[in-house]
Amino acid sequence: MSWCDGSDDNYDLNLERVSNTDHPSVQLKDQSQSCVTSRPDSKISAETPITTCPSCGHKLHHHQDDQVGSIKDLPSLPAGVKFDPSDKEILMHLEAKVSSDKRKLHPLIDEFIPTLEGENGICYTHPEKLPGVSKDGQVRHFFHRPSKAYTTGTRKRRKVSTDEEGHETRWHKTGKTRPVLSQSGETGFKKILVLYTNYGRQKKPEKTNWVMHQYHLGSSEDEKDGEPVLSKVFYQTQPRQCGSMEPKPKNLVNLNRFSYENIQAGFGYEHGGKSEETTQVIRELVVREGDGSCSFLSFTCDASKGKESFMKNQ
C-alpha cells in the first residue's frame, strides 16, 4: 500500500475539519482548538479532523480521542512508501488484533489492514470487488473470519458468490501449510490459495492469477471457525521463473568437468568400381582440467562393421 504515490509537488498532509454545530448537545471548548468538551453520541462530532493525501486525495477521519501517534501527528509520508510486512510482521499485527490489550494495536492499522465482515468477506466476494484491490500487482491486506462451508464438519467456505447463473468461483488451497514463527515466539501458519473459476460439476476448472496468502495463529494447521485471520490478496502479473531458460548446445552434456560430444563424419570410397559411403560416429569425452587445459578421449565407431576403437588426444 503506498501513500502519496503520484505527486512530486507537495508532500504536506492537509488537515480539514468538518463542523456540526446544529446538534444542541454538542459544545465547543474554543474556536481555536480542535477538542470537544462533550460528545454524547459517538457518531456525531462537532469537529472531525480529516487528513487528506495531497496525491490521491484519500481522506482519513480521526477523532480527538485517538491515541497519541496518530497520522495527524505525522508531518508527511514520502512518495514510494509502501506497506509490505514480512510473514513475522503479519503475525505480529494479527496478535495485536486478537489481543485484549488494544494498546498493542497500532493506531493506523485499520487504514492499512481493514476488517471485512459477513457478506463482505473474502470468501464471499470476488477479489476485484474488495476495497483497494486491482490487477496492478499490488498487495492488499485484510482481517477477516473464515466460516464453515456446511453446518457439520470442519471444511471451510471457499466459494465466492457470483451473479452469473451456473458460474462457480472458489479459492483452492495449493501446496503445504507452512509454520511461521512470530517475533514474540508464538507460532502461526501460512497457507496459499489460488482462485479458480467454473469449478463445478462437469465443468473444467480454470486457474486465474488471483492469489491469497492466509495467516492464522495457534498450533494447528487449520484455523478454527470464526477465528480472526489475516490475508493478503494480489493479482499475479508475472509468472514465476524456475531456473535459467538459456538453451543448451546440442550433443553436449556437461557433468562438472566432463562433457560428451557426438560428431558424425561421412567418408566416401570406391569398391569394385562402385562408390559407397559409410558414416562414422566419433564420440569424444572432453576432460576439462583445473588449469584450463583439455584432454580428449575419442571413441570411433564404424557403422558398417560395428567396431569401435579408442584414441586419446592430449
Curated annotation (Swiss-Prot):
Record field: compositional bias (Basic and acidic residues): 160-171
Tagged with keyword Transcription: yes
Function: Transcriptional activator that plays a regulatory role in the development of secondary cell wall fibers. Is a direct target of SND1.
Sequence ranges of Polar residues compositional bias: 18-39
GO cellular component: nucleus
Domain comment as written in the entry: The NAC domain includes a DNA binding domain and a dimerization domain.
Tissue: Expressed in protoxylem and elongating interfascicular fiber cells of elongating internodes, developing metaxylem cells and interfascicular fibers of non-elongating internodes and developing secondary xylem of roots.
Domain NAC positions: 77-236
Superkingdom field: Eukaryota
DNA-binding region of this protein: 187-242
A Gene Ontology BP annotation from the UniProt entry: regulation of secondary cell wall biogenesis
Alphabetized Gene3D superfamilies for the sequence: NAC domain
Lineage: Eukaryota, Viridiplantae, Streptophyta, Embryophyta, Tracheophyta
Record flagged with keyword Cytoplasm: no
One Pfam family matching this protein: NAM
Full protein name: NAC domain-containing protein 10
Main localization, broad class: nucleus
InterPro entries membership: NAC-dom, NAC_dom_sf, SOG1-like
PANTHER family in UniProt: NAC DOMAIN-CONTAINING PROTEIN 10, NAC DOMAIN-CONTAINING PROTEIN 73
SUPFAM superfamilies linked: NAC domain
Renumbered residue ranges of the record's region Disordered: 18-48, 150-182
